[in-house]
Amino acid sequence: MKSDEIIEAVIGAKALAVLTGAGVSTLSGIPDFRGPQGLYKNPDAERIFDIDWFDRDPSIYYNGCRELVYGLNKYAPSACHLTLAKLEKRGILKGIATQNIDMLHQRAGSEAVYEVHGSPRLHHCRNCGKARAYAEIVAELETKGERLTAQDVPRCACGGVFKPDITFFGEALPEEAFVASQELAIRADVMLVIGTSLTVFPAAGLPRLTLQAGGRVFIVNGSPTPLDDYASGKAEDIASFSAMLSHRRPGFCSMAVTLLSMLSTLSDMTLCFSAITAMLVAMLSSVSCLRSTSSSRC
């Protein structure tokens, strides 16, 4: 299936869900943890995100992640992040389940984001539970020397170490985010998987929930995945796909379906008239885009 056919299915979805992985963030310049320049090439890789090692010597984590995790502000959301945010604002996308910890979906403007592996947005004291914001931790680390000892890492007034709300090996996934992701997958009539090889569970099981519930799954990833044979379509170039999706507007058929759905829930004639007017404006805008593909509004 060609990319434009996948895009038609995505735009026409009644309840679109998206699962994103590292391939989305590499477009922003963030190294894939498992890539050639990734964190897992670090000799301490197995210990960096291990909760037992963190409690034993938190400097292993803070030294290993100082550049990648605490330098995230230098990266900007990619075209893919921005496109997904637009789809949410248009009411097509119902939510994003992401394996990424970089918070770029939120910076792009997405609101319904479920971080199934957590994120460093908040840090909590391992002793008393007090929370500190990511920006505070970054600011503190900027005052420290190049190499941290266990005593140099961010600590609470009680003496406890601040740990990011990233899921470490040996910890359970954040229950609220993962349950919400499962519900999102089950309700979706279309799930779009972008930038993940679907090998890390339990997040990799989310598209299967969509399939089991009767929905369709489309995959955009540069390498094969275990679900390729079960997907309704597959594309490989994430950047190209994102660009095409960004410039695609709903066709008349999908607009008409949306209009009828809206009117069926409205009893007040004034509201009905307003809904019809809004849809006609959107249709005229779509025609304008088709006639002038170079228009910035397209």
Residue ranges and their predicted role:
Residues 1-248:
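Conserved catalytic core of sirtuin-type NAD+-dependent deacylases
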Residues 240-242, 246-298:
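Low-acidity, Ser/Thr- and Arg-rich intrinsically disordered low-complexity segments
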